[in-house]
Amino acid sequence: MKIRVYFFKETDPEIILRGNKISSQALNTIYDLVWENEFKNILNAVRIWIKFMEEEQPFGTPLRKKKNHYKISLGDIIQISNDFYMVDKVGVKKIKVIE
């Protein structure tokens, strides 16, 4: 199971939080892929969110050294296989990525 974490590049995540879907083009332009790994165990998005909230370098070295922020925060996206979850004020919510 492939896990990816995307950090939001913009300054106001409230705009993106209003909807429950995002286009794949927006995902590639306003988000940076900062971390990717493959797991054999089944993980859920909340466990990954907690891991990123609590640790300085969760799961090892990030893909990108230059980031807008260093901790997972509001508006960031966690991808687990083909499912996408957006970090909300508390926890995560499932979103749809459309072509």
Which positions does each model-derived feature cover?
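Short, conserved turn/kink motifs that form compact alpha/beta structural patches or helix kinks used as
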Residues: 22-80
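N-terminal disorder-to-order initiation segments that are Gly/Lys/Arg-biased
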Residues: 1-37
